[in-house]
UniProtKB/Swiss-Prot annotation:
Region described as Protease: spans on this chain: 446-609, 446-610
Modified residues (Phosphoserine): 57, 117, 157
Assigned protein family: Belongs to the peptidase C48 family.
Domain of life: Eukaryota
Protease in keyword set: yes
Lineage: Eukaryota, Metazoa, Chordata, Craniata, Vertebrata
Protein's name according to its UniProt entry: Sentrin-specific protease 1
Region entry Disordered, spans: 19-122, 267-309
Organism of origin: Mus musculus (Mouse)
Documented EC number(s): 3.4.22.-
Pfam families: Peptidase_C48
Active site: 529, 546, 599
Length: 640
C-alpha cells in the first residue's frame, strides 16, 4: 500500500486527528513487562525537552484518560519496558517520520497489539517547561522490527494552525451567535460592577468561579501582559492539575489563531462526556512547538494557563479558584461625588425653600395688616361723612359714650361680685360631711337638702332640685323693677311635652298666663346633658342654647307648636306665628364648656344673663366661682 493509502486508511489501532490532518499510529507493546512500581515511577518522571537541529521533540505518557486503577490488562503498558531512570524522547527524522532517541535499556521480545489506540494524557513536568507530545508507546529501543515493517508517515496537510483554526472555528460545524466586542465589554463591566457592589455591601471577597462565556479581548491582553505571574501560579499548582496545549507553526507572525474560552470549554466538556481526549490549538509567536491539552480527571476541575517561554500570547483553558484582586475604591469615586453633590444641593434646596416659606408668611402678614388698615380707613371715612351733617351733636355723643363706658364698668363689677370671707366659711361649712337628708333651704314649694347641695361641689352634676330652685329665684327676681318678666318651666316639662304631647302638660299652666310674660325659660334634659330653650315674646324668637355646640331645631318647633295649642286652649284664638324665628346658637356665639360636668351650670348662667338682658360674657374659668356663689344664693334664697 502506498503512502497515500497509509495516510487515509487506518487499522483498528489507528486514530486520525481530523483537525490536524495527520495520522498517528500506536503499536501494542510486547507481552513481557516490568513490575507496577516501575510503571508508576516512569509516569511521574519529568520529560526533558531537547532542542537541536530538529524542529521539535515531544514526550507523551502512555496512559489513556479512560484509565482507572482497577483496570487490568493482559498486555502490560509499554512503560514497563523503561527503567526507573529512563526518559523517552522522540525526534523527527529528515523524512518527517518520528524516531526514538532513547537508548534501549534492554532487549525483550515484542508482539504486536491486538487493538491499538492513541493514548493522550495531560502531564505537567516538575521543571515547569512546556508540555510535550508522545506519538508511540513501544519505542524502548532505537528501532523495533514492527517499526521497520510499518513505518509511521505523517499525512500531508496544510499549516497546522490554519487547519486547526478552520476546523474548530468553522461555522459549518457549530453555529453560534458571536457577540461583538462592545456587548462583551458591557456585560463584563456590568458583572464587575455588581461584584464590587456585593463586596462593598457584605465586606467579603467575591471571586469568579469560572470564566464567562464570552471572554473580552481586553482581559486577554491583560492576561498576556501578566504572563510571569501566571507562570508562577502554574508552578505552584503543578501538583493539583495538568493541562497540555498543542500549538502550531505559523507561516507568518500575523497568521496566529485565536480560540475563545467558550469554544475551548464546550469542546472540553464534549470530550469528557464521550471519553475521548480533548485537543486545543494555539499559535506562539516565538516558539513553534506544539502542545496537546487533555483533561486530568473527569471529576476534577483543573485550571492552568500554559504558555511557552518567550511567548507573547496566552490561551486560557480553565480558571480554578482565581483570586480576583480587591476592587479599587476609585471605581465608585464618580458615584460618591454625585452623592456628595446631591446632598449639598438638597441642603441648599431645603434652605432655599425655608427662606421662601418665611418670605411667604411675612408677605401674608403684611398683606393682612394692609387690608385691616384699609378697612379701618374705609370705616373712618364713612363715619366721617355721616357725621358731617351732625357736627354740632358730636360733643353730646361723646358724653353719652363716656356714660355708657362708666355704666359698663359698674355692670362688670356687679356681674361678678366678690365672695367675702364670711361667705366662704359658710359655703365650706355646707360642703362638710353631715346628715345628707338635712334640709338646708326651702322655698317655692321646693326643699334643698345637704345631698342636693353636694352636687354643686367640685365637678359634680347638678340635679333637678338645684336647677328648679335656681329657675324659681330667677322668676322671683324678675318681679323687681328693671327686669323683664320671666316664667320658667319645670325640668320635666319639655320631656313630658315631647313624649306625651300637649294634653299631658295642659294643666301645668292652669294658674299662669304664659303669653303675659316677656321670657319663657324651658330647661331641657337630654339624658346626660342639660340645655336651655328661651322663648322671647318681645323679639318673637325661640332660641336654643347648648354648651356643647349642639343644634336642636326640633325642640324649637315643639315649643312653637305648644304656643299654638296653648293659645287655642287658653285664649280661644289662633296664635299668630308671623315673624317668629327659630334659632340654635352656634358654638362660636356662646361660651362652651371644656369638661363633662358643667353643662347644668352653663344652662343656669345662660338663663341668668338672658333674664337680666345682659350679654353672656362668662367662660369655663368662672365655673368654680359660680358654683360657690350659687350655694350661697340657694342658702339665702337670693340672687347676688
Amino acid at each position: 500500500m502506498d503512502d497515500t493509502a497509509d495516510g487515509v486508511k487506518m487499522d483498528a489501532g489507528e486514530v486520525t486527528l481530523v483537525n490536524h490532518g495527520s495520522t498517528f499510529r500506536t503499536h501494542r507493546p510486547p507481552q513481557s513487562g516490568f513490575p507496577e512500581e516501575q510503571l508508576l515511577l516512569s509516569d511521574q518522571q519529568s520529560l526533558p525537552f531537547r532542542q537541536g537541529t530538529l524542529d521539535g521533540s515531544f514526550t507523551c505518557s502512555t496512559r489513556s484518560p479512560a484509565y482507572r486503577p482497577d483496570y487490568h490488562s493482559d498486555n502490560p503498558s509499554s512503560d514497563s519496558f523503561l527503567g526507573s531512570g529512563d526518559v523517552r524522547t522522540f525526534g523527527q527524522s529528515a523524512n518527517g517520520q518520528w524516531r526514538n532517541s532513547t537508548p534501549a535499556s534492554g532487549s525483550a521480545p515484542q508482539k504486536p497489539r491486538n487493538s491499538r489506540s492513541l493514548c493522550l494524557e495531560t502531564r505537567k513536568t516538575s521543571s515547569g517547561l512546556s508540555n510535550t507530545f508522545v506519538g508511540k508507546s513501544n519505542h524502548h529501543c532505537h528501532m523495533s522490527a514492527y517499526e521497520k515493517s510499518f513505518p509511521i508517515k505523517p499525512a500531508p496537510s496544510p499549516s497546522w494552525s490554519g487547519s486547526c483554526r478552520r476546523s474548530l472555528l468553522s461555522p459549518k460545524k457549530t453555529q453560534r451567535r458571536h457577540f461583538s466586542t462592545a456587548e462583551e465589554t458591557v456585560q463584563e463591566e456590568e458583572k464587575e460592577i455588581y461584584r464590587q457592589l456585593l463586596q462593598m455591601v457584605t465586606g467579603k471577597q467575591f471571586c469568579v468561579a469560572k470564566p464567562t462565556t464570552h471572554f473580552p479581548l481586553r482581559l486577554s491582553r491583560c492576561l498576556s501582559s501578566n504572563k510571569n505571574s501566571l507562570k508562577d501560579s502554574l508552578l505552584r499548582n503543578g501538583n493539583s492539575c495538568a493541562s497540555h496545549v498543542i500549538g502550531s507553526d505559523t507561516s507568518s507572525s500575523g497568521s496566529a489563531s485565536i480560540l475563545t474560552a467558550q469554544e475551548q470549554l464546550s469542546h472540553s466538556a464534549h470530550s469528557l462526556s464521550s471519553g475521548t481526549p480533548d485537543v486545543a490549538f494555539g499559535s506562539k509567536d516565538s516558539d513553534p512547538h506544539h502542545h496537546l491539552a487533555a483533561p486530568h480527571q473527569p471529576n476534577s476541575l483543573p485550571a492552568s494557563n500554559t504558555q511557552s517561554e518567550g511567548s507573547d500570547s496566552v490561551i486560557l483553558l480553565k480558571v480554578k479558584e482565581s483570586q480576583t484582586p480587591a476592587s479599587s475604591p476609585t471605581f465608585f469615586q464618580a458615584e460618591l461625588w454625585i452623592k456628595e453633590l446631591t446632598s449639598v444641593y438638597d441642603s441648599r434646596a431645603r434652605e432655599r425653600l425655608r427662606r421662601i416659606e418665611e418670605q411667604k408668611a411675612l408677605a401674608l402678614q403684611l398683606q393682612n395688616q394692609r387690608l385691616q388698615e384699609q378697612e379701618h380707613a374705609v370705616l373712618d371715612s364713612v363715619e366721617l361723612h355721616l357725621r358731617v351733617p351732625l357736627e354740632k351733636e358730636i360733643p353730646v355723643t361723646a358724653a353719652q359714650e363716656t356714660r355708657k363706658k362708666s355704666h359698663q364698668l359698674t355692670d362688670s363689677e356687679d356681674e361678678f361680685p366678690e365672695i367675702t370671707e364670711e361667705m366662704e366659711k359658710e359655703i365650706k361649712n355646707v360642703f362638710r360631711n353631715g346628715n345628707q337628708d338635712e334640709v338646708l333651704s326651702e322655698a317655692f314649694r321646693l326643699t334643698i337638702t345637704r345631698k342636693d347641695i353636694q352636687t354643686l361641689n367640685h365637678l359634680n352634676w347638678l340635679n333637678d332640685e338645684i336647677i328648679n330652685f335656681y329657675m324659681n329665684m330667677l322668676m322671683e327676681r324678675s318681679k323687681e323693677k328693671g327686669f323683664p318678666s320671666v316664667h320658667a318651666f319645670n325640668t320635666f316639662f319639655f320631656t313630658k311635652l315631647k313624649t306625651a304631647g300637649y294634653q299631658a302638660v295642659k294643666r301645668w299652666t292652669k294658674k299662669v298666663d304664659v303669653f303675659s310674660v316677656d321670657i319663657l325659660l324651658v330647661p331641657i334634659h337630654l339624658g346626660v346633658h342639660w340645655c336651655l330653650a328661651v322663648v322671647d315674646f318681645r323679639r318673637k324668637s325661640i332660641t336654643y342654647y347648648d354648651s356643647m355646640g349642639g343644634i336642636n331645631n326640633e325642640a324649637c318647633r315643639i315649643l312653637l307648636q305648644y304656643l299654638k295649642q296653648e293659645s287655642v286652649d287658653k285664649k280661644r284664638k289662633e296664635f299668630d306665628t308671623n315673624g317668629w324665628q327659630l334659632f340654635s346658637k352656634k358654638s362660636q356665639e356662646i361660651p362652651q364648656q371644656m369638661n363633662g360636668s358643667d353643662c347644668g351650670m352653663f344652662a343656669c348662667k345662660y338663663a341668668d344673663c338672658i333674664t337680666k338682658d345682659r350679654p353672656i360674657n362668662f367662660t369655663q374659668q368662672h365655673m368654680p366661682y359660680f358654683r360657690k356663689r350659687m350655694v350661697w344664693e340657694i342658702l339665702h334664697r337670693k340672687l347676688l
